[in-house]
């Protein structure tokens, strides 16, 4: 899929938003990719995940893991296309953990799949879970990389849409200086106790 084609899919799905947003990372931006609005369409979900799975066809993968909430749908479909189990991590008291009986085995080769990467914070937390279990990070795949490839999380990494989007520290955000209303559509605040 070409970059213009992917951007067209986001636009036609109402998933490429402009305004003043607080991202899951805590940074602010004038652009937000609401992947859920794209991934709700089976034809887009299938094609996007086919591209992610294809990017890792030369790597042995035993399992796919995704951070909740945004990565679950794309991770599950990517795992289905690869023919491997899929699990997800989630926050408990602010910490990314495995729950629901999910486990990783030593030496298991794991592909981490996320919807959007900005700073890579959530994926880094999942990498920590994987390595502490003695499993091996086989790669990181995502739908969108807002850093234009500047955030390196694994030796093998693939993003379907890789572009640089302006992000601002909240203390120096020009959108805040203009008193524009702040929208926080991300899922970081969704935690389980």
Curated annotation (Swiss-Prot):
The residues the record assigns to binding 5-phospho-alpha-D-ribose 1-diphosphate are 114-122
Query: EC class of this enzyme?
Result: transferase
Where along this sequence does the record place binding of orotate?
118, 146
Alphabetical UniProt keywords: Glycosyltransferase, Magnesium, Pyrimidine biosynthesis, Transferase
Its EC number is 2.4.2.10
Superkingdom: Bacteria
Catalysed reaction, written as an equation: orotidine 5'-phosphate + diphosphate = orotate + 5-phospho-alpha-D-ribose 1-diphosphate
Q: Keyword check for Signal, yes or no.
A: no
**Cofactor dependency:** Mg(2+)
- Provide one Gene Ontology biological process annotation: 'de novo' UMP biosynthetic process
Q: In which pathway does it act?
A: Pyrimidine metabolism; UMP biosynthesis via de novo pathway; UMP from orotate: step 1/2
**Which GO MF terms does the UniProt record name?**
magnesium ion binding; orotate phosphoribosyltransferase activity
Described by its record, this protein's role is as follows: Catalyzes the transfer of a ribosyl phosphate group from 5-phosphoribose 1-diphosphate to orotate, leading to the formation of orotidine monophosphate (OMP).
Family, as annotated: Belongs to the purine/pyrimidine phosphoribosyltransferase family. PyrE subfamily.
Q: Which NCBIfam families match?
A: pyrE_Therm (TIGR01367)
Q: Can you state the subunit structure given in the record? A: Homodimer.
Write the protein's name: Orotate phosphoribosyltransferase
Organism listed in the record: Chlorobium phaeobacteroides (strain BS1)
Q: What is the lineage of its organism?
A: Bacteria, Pseudomonadati, Chlorobiota, Chlorobiia, Chlorobiales
């Amino acid at each position: 899929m070409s970059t213009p084609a992917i951007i067209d899919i986001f636009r036609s799905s109402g998933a490429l938003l402009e305004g003043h947003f607080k991202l899951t990372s805590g940074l602010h931006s004038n652009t937000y990719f609401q992947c859920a609005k794209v991934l709700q369409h089976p034809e887009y979900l299938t094609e996007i995940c086919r591209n992610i799975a294809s990017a890792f066809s030369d790597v042995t993968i035993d399992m796919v893991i995704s951070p909740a909430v945004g990565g679950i749908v794309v991770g599950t479909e990517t795992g289905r296309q690869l023919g491997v189990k899929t699990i997800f991590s989630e926050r408990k008291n602010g910490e990314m953990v495995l729950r629901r009986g999910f486990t990783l085995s030593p030496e298991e080769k794991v592909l981490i799949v996320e919807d959007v990467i900005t700073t890579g914070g959530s994926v880094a937390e999942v990498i920590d879970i994987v390595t502490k279990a003695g499993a091996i990070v086989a790669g990181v795949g995502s739908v969108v990389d807002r850093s234009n490839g500047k955030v390196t999380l694994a030796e093998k990494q693939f993003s379907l849409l890789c572009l640089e989007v302006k992000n601002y520290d909240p203390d120096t955000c020009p959108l805040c200086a203009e008193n524009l209303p702040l929208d926080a559509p991300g899922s970081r605040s969704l935690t389980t106790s």
